[in-house]
Amino acid sequence: MEFGVFDHLDRYGGALADYYEDRLKIAEAYDRAGFHAYHLAEHHSTPLGMAPSPSVFLAAVAERTRRLRFGPLVWPMPLHHPLRLIEEICMLDQLSGGRLDIGFGRGAAPIELEYYGVAPQDAQEIYAEAVELVIKGLTHKVLDFKGRRFSFSGVPMELEPLQKPHPPIWYGLHAPESAERAARRGLNVVSLDPTNEARLAIERYRTIWRQVHAPASALPKLGLGRFIVVAPSDAAALAKARRAYLVWHESFTHLFRRHGRAQSHPRPASFDLLTERGQGIAGSPATVAEFLARELSATGCNYVVGQFAFGDLTLTESLQSIGLFASEVMPLLRAKAAVGAKEMAGVAAHGRR
């Protein structure tokens, strides 16, 4: 059982330079605590995302950490030129000693695409072609490509990734249909959706995976993304989470309210409603571990992705939450996972008799 982190890098006020420094201190804490990877969102012209260029912030993360893997979740491909992205991927992977993960998407916020002059209805086609192009560029010395959106002939690929054939690829799940595409390609995935929706997508992923890949193939990471606040008591954790989530939600809905549009992927307006939908938990280590164990069992995910820094949570509050999660929640969940694996092995052995 491994654990990751998801971060919007959402702003709540104060000097921006101080904010970045605090977030880098939090990244150092993730590294010390033994988290597997740090997954960073990309957003534009909104307080929801203070990392409109994930590569820049991730380069700083690479410098401040030693073991933590990291990467975008996701790069919205219609907003990135594929050739430049190929070069950035190679640089980040080499600079970090091969700790980069890469995530691609079409862009979840139509308003942000429109700011860049991209028609939302074109996003899927651009995404599909750009991803194919980037993977080809990472695995060939010379890039030749002809598509509807991009065409290149004889472009030398002077840079190369350290990880071969390329860094691990991630995709954000929102529906069973996207799960099917990801499973066929063997991508790692993360779902931020409510319990039942995540379950349906992960079930579809596992079904297609078994049909397409060899039985001995290692199952990719199936991530369960959840807001998490840990404190010594349930009451203390809830008070922090309720306060901070309201601030985060203001940032999340900022562009939609500004333009009078409905949210493309709505989130509940309160932390209590979020918890009812299975998308967040605040409590003592025991409470958080029990919740996550239920969610993992219900959805079929095998990788916990916590959002520990959001809204107006202070540096001290986030560091306390991360520390308690690492020292008390992680061991509880790993013990439960070990028991489950042992039981499954016993069932399999009995079936072979």
Residues of each region from the PLM?
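Flexible, glycine-rich active-site loops centered on histidine and acidic residues
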Residues: 2-18, 78-145, 149, 189-191, ...
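Active-site mouth loops of central-metabolism enzymes
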Residues: 7-20, 75-83, 163-173, 276-285
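Hydrophobic faces of well-ordered beta-strands that scaffold small-molecule active sites
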Residues: 3-7, 38-40, 70-72, 100-104, ...
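Short, acidic/polar
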Residues: 17-29, 173-180, 287-295
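Acidic (Asp/Glu)-rich catalytic clusters
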Residues: 31-32, 58-66, 89-99, 183-184, ...
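N-terminal beta1-alpha1-beta2 module of alpha/beta enzyme domains
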Residues: 1-70, 164-167, 343-350
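Conserved, mostly hydrophobic/aromatic
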Residues: 3, 30, 34, 42, ...
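An alpha-helical appendage that flanks or caps ligand/catalytic pockets
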Residues: 122-157, 196-302, 334-353
